[in-house]
């Protein structure tokens, strides 16, 4: 690999090439949350639009882009460790470029290049669209380009995207967060919440469905707050905007499953629950972050709700959606957490009956109020409580899953999903409630089962973190997404919507069905 040159072909965009005249290859490595996964799809779309091609497996790419996370300390260590390993690779391949973006880049800024001088580009959460230009500038100037801006330049939706999946897609409803949780660094890195126009969101959903996608997940740091700060000044504040958006998704023909993440218990309202219950394609799944079952700790976290309020939400959801699967996030070892506080968390876990829980040991993040609290807990105390919580939650998970033995479930077949699938000869899929099911691909099958197809199976065995269905496939429905998966084709979405106060940029016309759905929201 040698230094790149830029070749301008007549009538074409500028294409990055190696000295040998080959188009440059890229790889995007993603750390962190679903937001980062979706941002990485935008990065891939940007790079391919600029002329790069995805690097084949088991090859050294000409460009490696890290989309980073800053929520936990081990994310920092993981990134800098990986960058250290790449130093020798880059020395052997002088034309190689390395770019670091995302939340950790937004946080560390110049520190990234100080710790890893062989990095070529550092960009933040607010200017991912600048990456191709920064890469060219770094190559031309033969020095690192660090560009971090303090506010969002444009919604990521005005950038092209190359999707990871042929059958399931992410769609952002907002960027940023207005909450001030004392443990969380995300608002300082992602900025204040700004909401997309409903019509733009639905246009993006329609564009995905038109390419075969059957499942969409609506993304936001706090989806319940959607509608409080539309970027379009012509749209009035609307606290029921999210429930209207869910109902509008129900009118899109061909969209079979809709999920969303993440809501906030303090702002979760009955109109959203009603929309979930009354809209057939909204999945009976809810991710509701608890963080702690102790009211004292919740107050210190600045979470704006208490355990009674949290449990009342779950009661209402289950009353209206009896088979809903509810998952959560829990932090163990927050500063000042006592044994009594921890027991309160265990009590809520036992009452809530979560299908699964993402449990974390508290990690102090510089720049957050909680990192400055004096009553930080010893590591061994946090570890011991974490292990006890895992035992309780795992037992709850298995008990809840046992209830499904003998039931028939519809699965959207997914790529991968089971580490032992090769050995067990099984495939994997997600039920409508989000549970992972490993199944035997035999029985009433219409040709080969592909990721993106739908099957129905009967649950024969339950484990804490997944279900098994070994009695054979009862029905198999082939899909356009399955056809696309079979040939390695994934959706691409063109720029949709408006920038922040900018003129409209390449927004496609909304399909008629989507236009009618939008009207009730706007």
Curated annotation (Swiss-Prot):
Co-factor note (free text): Binds 2 [4Fe-4S] clusters. One cluster is coordinated with 3 cysteines and an exchangeable S-adenosyl-L-methionine.
SUPFAM superfamilies for this protein: Radical SAM enzymes
Binding positions for [4Fe-4S] cluster 1 per the UniProt entry: 33, 69, 103
Compartment annotation: Cytoplasm
GO terms of molecular function: 4 iron, 4 sulfur cluster binding; metal ion binding; N6-isopentenyladenosine methylthiotransferase activity
Source organism, top-level taxon: Bacteria
Key words of the record: 4Fe-4S, Cytoplasm, Iron, Iron-sulfur, Metal-binding, S-adenosyl-L-methionine, Transferase, tRNA processing
Binding site for [4Fe-4S] cluster 2: 177, 181, 184
SMART domains: Elp3
Broad class of enzyme this protein falls into: transferase
Domain TRAM: 402-473
Domain Radical SAM core: 163-399
Major subcellular site: cytoplasm
InterPro entries membership: Elp3/MiaA/NifB-like_rSAM, Methylthiotransferase, Methylthiotransferase_CS, Methylthiotransferase_N, Methylthiotransferase_N_sf, MiaB_methiolase, rSAM, rSAM_horseshoe
Gene Ontology cellular component terms for the protein in this record: cytosol
Function (record text): Catalyzes the methylthiolation of N6-(dimethylallyl)adenosine (i(6)A), leading to the formation of 2-methylthio-N6-(dimethylallyl)adenosine (ms(2)i(6)A) at position 37 in tRNAs that read codons beginning with uridine.
Family: Belongs to the methylthiotransferase family. MiaB subfamily.
Name of the protein: tRNA-2-methylthio-N(6)-dimethylallyladenosine synthase
Source organism per UniProt: Corynebacterium glutamicum (strain ATCC 13032 / DSM 20300 / JCM 1318 / BCRC 11384 / CCUG 27702 / LMG 3730 / NBRC 12168 / NCIMB 10025 / NRRL B-2784 / 534)
């Amino acid at each position: 690999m040698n230094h790149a040159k830029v070749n301008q072909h007549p009538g074409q965009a500028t294409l990055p090439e190696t000295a040998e005249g080959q188009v440059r290859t890229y790889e995007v490595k993603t750390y962190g949350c679903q937001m980062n996964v979706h941002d990485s799809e935008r990065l891939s779309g940007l790079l391919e639009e600029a002329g790069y091609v995805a690097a084949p497996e088991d090859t050294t790419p000409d460009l490696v882009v890290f989309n980073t996370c800053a929520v936990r300390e081990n994310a920092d260590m993981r990134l800098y460790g990986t960058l250290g390993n790449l130093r020798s690779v880059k020395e052997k391949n002088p034309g190689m470029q390395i770019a670091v973006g995302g939340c950790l880049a937004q946080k560390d800024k110049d520190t990234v290049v100080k710790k890893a001088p062989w990095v070529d580009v550092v960009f933040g959460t607010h200017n991912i669209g600048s990456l191709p230009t920064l890469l060219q500038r770094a190559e031309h100037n033969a020095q690192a380009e660090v560009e971090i801006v303090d506010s969002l330049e444009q919604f990521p939706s005005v950038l092209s995207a190359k999707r990871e999946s042929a059958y399931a897609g992410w769609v952002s409803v907002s960027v940023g967060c207005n909450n001030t949780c004392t443990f969380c660094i995300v608002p300082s890195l992602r900025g204040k919440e700004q909401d997309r126009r409903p019509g733009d969101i639905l246009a993006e959903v329609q564009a995905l469905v038109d390419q075969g996608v059957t499942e969409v997940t609506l993304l936001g740091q706090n989806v319940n707050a959607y509608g409080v700060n539309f970027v379009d000044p012509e749209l009035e504040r609307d606290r029921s905007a999210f429930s209207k958006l869910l109902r509008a998704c129900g009118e899109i023909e061909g969209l079979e499953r809709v999920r969303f993440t993440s809501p906030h218990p303090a702002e979760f309202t009955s109109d959203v629950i009603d929309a979930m219950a009354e809209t057939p394609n909204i999945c009976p799944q809810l991710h509701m972050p608890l963080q702690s079952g102790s009211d004292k700790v919740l107050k210190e976290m600045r979470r704006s709700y208490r355990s009674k309020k949290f449990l009342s939400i779950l009661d209402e959801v289950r009353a209206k959606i009896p088979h809903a699967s509810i998952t959560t996030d829990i932090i163990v070892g927050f500063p000042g957490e006592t044994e009594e506080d921890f027991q309160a968390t265990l009590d809520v876990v036992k009452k809530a009956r979560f299908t699964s829980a993402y449990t974390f040991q508290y990690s102090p993040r510089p720049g957050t109020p909680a990192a400055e609290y004096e009553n930080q807990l010893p590591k061994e105390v946090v570890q011991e409580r974490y292990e006890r919580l895992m035992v309780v939650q795992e037992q709850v998970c298995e008990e809840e899953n046992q209830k499904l033995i003998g039931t028939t479930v519809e699965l959207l077949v997914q790529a991968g999903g089971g580490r032992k699938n090769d050995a067990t000869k099984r495939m994997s899929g997600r039920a409508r409630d989000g549970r992972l099911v490993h199944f035997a691909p035999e029985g009433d099958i219409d040709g080969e089962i592909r990721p993106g197809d739908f099957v129905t199976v009967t649950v024969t065995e339950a484990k804490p973190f997944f279900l098994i269905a070994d009695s054979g496939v009862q029905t198999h429905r082939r899909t356009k997404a399955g056809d696309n998966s079979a040939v390695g084709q994934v959706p691409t979405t063109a720029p949709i919507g408006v920038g922040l106060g900018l003129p409209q940029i390449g927004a496609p016309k909304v399909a008629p069905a989507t236009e009618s759905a939008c009207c009730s929201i706007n």
